[in-house]
């Protein structure tokens, strides 16, 4: 992976934001935190898309992916929370120390865990490659061997959902690839969609109801693509128009790319 060479000039973005700019408005998301805790989301929309295939299994990577809050609990940031609210609310879990407190943090372009999950998919959701992927991801983050063995022993069998959900978990800090995987496969099913009504209990005795309201009117799913920048309209208008005409819904966030078949 790429390694930052000097903390004064090239400090890792999360390190700079947390330690230099004193930002506290970013945290592990509520759906992802619940997935790793082994919980199902409290979803009031009536959809069953938030079922956790690893229900009842707390993932040992959670303690490395995120930092406990002041009460010693892991609490994710609701998807509808504003930056100003995030600055005030102190109950949410920031990214882990290995992320925000390492000035030369590096991220691999492709890890062995991802390769293992690809091999599992290629071989009809193979169990061995599936387990190898989980083990490789946990070893990369420093999970103790005994915890890895116990977690793998409790895993449900390899399937499309379990393999691709574990792949998504392993892609933490590689958001672009995780987004691509969702668009390609439709997994994980634990993501919240625009319009979903849900509840979160950040502290004991405090339950807050939320509605995931999209900032883009009419959007009902996670965006499938980014729109062309405005300068393409003026500097490359003809080619832009030709490209837009080939999209399923024009230059919109919900137009699928050619490889996005699910």
Residue positions per predicted region:
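Hydrophobic-face positions in mid-chain alpha helices that act as interaction patches
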Residues: 1-119, 125-170, 174-176, 185, ...
């Amino acid at each position: 992976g790429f390694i930052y060479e000097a903390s004064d000039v090239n400090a890792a973005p999360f390190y700079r934001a947390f330690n230099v700019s004193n930002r506290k408005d970013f945290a592990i998301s509520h759906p992802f935190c619940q997935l790793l805790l082994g919980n199902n989301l409290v979803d009031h929309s009536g959809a069953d898309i938030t079922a956790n295939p690893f229900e009842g299994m707390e993932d040992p990577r959670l303690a490395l992916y995120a930092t406990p809050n002041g009460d010693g609990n892991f609490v994710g940031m609701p998807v509808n929370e504003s930056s100003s609210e995030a600055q005030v609310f102190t109950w949410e879990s920031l990214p882990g120390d290995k992320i925000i407190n390492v000035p030369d943090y590096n991220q691999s372009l492709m890890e062995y865990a991802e390769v293992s999950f690809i091999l599992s998919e290629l071989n009809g959701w193979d169990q061995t490659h599936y387990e190898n992927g989980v083990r490789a991801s946990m070893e990369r983050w420093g999970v103790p061997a005994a915890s890895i063995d116990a977690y793998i022993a409790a895993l449900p069998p390899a399937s499309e959902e379990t393999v691709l959900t574990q792949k998504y978990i392993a892609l933490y800090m590689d958001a672009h690839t995780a987004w691509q995987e969702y668009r390609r496969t439709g997994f994980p099913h634990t993501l919240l969609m625009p319009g979903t009504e849900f509840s979160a209990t950040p502290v004991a005795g405090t339950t807050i109801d939320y509605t995931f309201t999209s900032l883009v009117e009419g959007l009902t799913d996670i965006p499938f693509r980014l729109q062309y920048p405005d300068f393409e309209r003026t500097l490359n208008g003809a080619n832009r128009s030709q490209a837009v005409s080939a999209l399923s819904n024009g230059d919109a966030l919900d137009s699928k790319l050619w490889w996005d078949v699910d």
